[in-house]
Amino acid sequence: GIELHYSGMPFVRTVMQEKTNDELRLFIVLSLGITALILFLFFRSWTSVVVPLIVISVVVVWVLGTVGILNYKITVLTGLIPSIIVVIGIPNAVYLLNKYHQEFAKHGNKIKALSRMVRKIGMVTFITNFTTAIGFLVLLTTDIKLLKEFGLVAGINILATFVVSIVLIPGILSYLPAPKANQLKHLEFKIVGRFLVLLDLLVHRHRYRVFAATAVILTVAIVGVTKLYSVAYMVDDIPEKSQLKQDLYFFEDNFSGVMPLEIIIDFGRPKSTINARNLRRVDQLEEALEPLENVSSPVSIVSFAKAVRQAFYNGNERFYGLPSPSDRNVILSYLSNQSDNASFLSSFVDTTGQVMRVSLKIADIGSNKMDSLINHVIEPEIDKVFKDDEEISTAVTGSTLLFVKGNQFLIENLRFSLLLAFVIIAIIMAILFANIRMIVISLIPNFIPLIMTAGIMGYFGIPLKPSTALIFSIAFGISVDDSIHFLAKYRQELFAKKFFVPIAISNSIKETGSSMLYTSIILFFGFVIFVFSDFGGTVALGLLTSLTLFFAMFTNLTLLPALLMVFDSGKRNQNFHPLIEHYEFYIEDEDEEIDTQNLLIKENDPFVGTTKK
């Protein structure tokens, strides 16, 4: 039978949109499933699984509602947001539940445990959600509509996740029975406990080895960064084995590709496109472009006129060429008067007859080669033909050129976004801690994982392109959350232990370490699910973000406390307190005891209606 091959950018976009809709549903199910499984393995309690999932389900509905309210479409990027919200929102629940269980284990008072949970974790959770949102909201500084929509919807709903979490989780827990003994067993999880003890010993006894190992890893990563290169393909998101990609290869092999490139020639005067001299010039340009590799035969009014002349002489190949003076008037009259021809000609000549379009197709050879082909081959050929005539102006355009220039522009935009995220988060740290040393200490463990990931990209030949450059600001905004949680607890312990740094660090590792481990594991597996995507960019986003967050978990659990041990004296000016120390939940002794007996309604209370016995 006849084998059909489909291609063209409209067809490619349609197929990709259908796949995006399918993956939206797939990733929501996968993200909910994987987080539910991990929560159950950690907490061994259905309550600790169901409560977070209720919260996250509410926010997922909000995400889809936000997309609709803003009149956005579900794209390759916005389709990922529900799954990303699931993965990022669950750590809120982990920190809140862990604190609730820790407090309840101390005194067995549910109301007091809920109160302390909100007071001690609430503000820190807001700050961490805010820094995570910053990693997405900085994408608004780009001039790419797709990224702006992605950043805005994600940023808004990450902040909404905090609101829903801090309202619903304590509210639901207040109606549920107090935790039973088996629900608190995870606090004594021996494997996690031993691992945290090991980290504590490493920080206290071998911190300089931690620095040495970090320096070696960083050096190796920097060498990898030097091997990093930037290149993108117009359809590199499409899987290699898909029928769509095979059809694209067929068109590249047989028709030099499907990526459109247009040459616009303005002759400066109306009706000058049919001038014999101008037609010869365009013919000269087309003959120069014809033999180029990865470029299709040019199509314009010139190539059409040559084909009509051949048809006029009964298809004789000898007559394939521009009309001669003897047959020129007849052929041009035929071209102008036939309705089908007129419709065709309007695609290549404007209504004034002053501007002509020459259309080419280019193979998807990568942004670098495309840029070189356009700037160093095609444009010089155009200049060679038309440079002597000042009346004539030319321009190269089309989606291929937009892709090449847009890719370069986008990479620069994303670099600026990362820098902006870095600066904004540094300012937040400055407001919280009001100490330059603490700002530097908090940022180093989160900057090193970015360099490590960039190094891996260099060693494995993973190019820097929009889908991979995107991960750095996102991962940085997420990874800094662990630093904030650790430093917040560290500040609290400094007050409680009279500013004795070693004990403050040990207690901080013991109390926040398990939550940091749990949330990092959830984030790692939550982003890993994107490797099941059919889009190469989504796979890269998931894999590289997972790696970055995995590295950040270790740097925040080892390098951060080691830096504090060496560079933080623990001394504080008694008359000056940074913003983070102004909140009562940082001082253990200020916890107000809640007498649950006072919450009971007295039988003879005059303000309460009588009840029948």
Regions found by a protein language model. Give the residues of each.
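Amphipathic alpha-helical segments in well-structured domains
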Residues: 59, 111-114, 156, 192, ...
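Generic non-transmembrane alpha-helical segments
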Residues: 1-2, 254, 284-294, 373-392, ...
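Membrane-embedded transmembrane helical bundles of large multi-pass transporters/channels
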Residues: 2-233, 365-366, 384-613
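Juxtamembrane segments of multi-pass membrane proteins
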Residues: 202, 206-327
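Extracytoplasmic
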Residues: 1, 14-18, 296-364, 405
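Composition- and surface-driven signal marking solvent-exposed, interaction-prone regions
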Residues: 237, 264, 274-281, 285, ...
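A short beta-strand structural signal in non-transmembrane regions
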Residues: 1, 5, 261-266, 272, ...
